[in-house]
Amino acid sequence: MIKKRARGNLSPNSGAKARRKGHNFERLIRKRLLPIYPKCQTSRYASKMLDDNGIDFVGTYPFVIQAKHVERGVNPQKILSEMIIEKGDIPVLFHKKKGYRTIATMWLDDWLENTTKLVVEKIL
């Protein structure tokens, strides 16, 4: 008979642990986005198609957001390039490494365009 491993005793390199950590990070980000975007949902819950396109949250227009909680390096350029977006969407990557604060990454052109709008409208 095959002996099953206890679920709570996952090794640090376990795929199940990494998956659970990623899902927990998505839930944490959603909780922080809710005051700004009350209709925000994870795409795992709301849209399998968006989840497959590398978009982790729905209801955050104009931003399309991917969340990554990683132990090793993340390649933001690759992740932002692989996100399948529509015209007018602004891709953003939230990524966190153990022991560090979460970082938001976006293309410089998108940042400049949005910051310019905020300055012109005297919001900043």
Question: Language-model segments: what does each one mean?
Answer:
Residues 1-124:
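Catalytic phosphate/metal-binding cores of nucleic-acid and nucleotide-processing enzymes, i.e., regions
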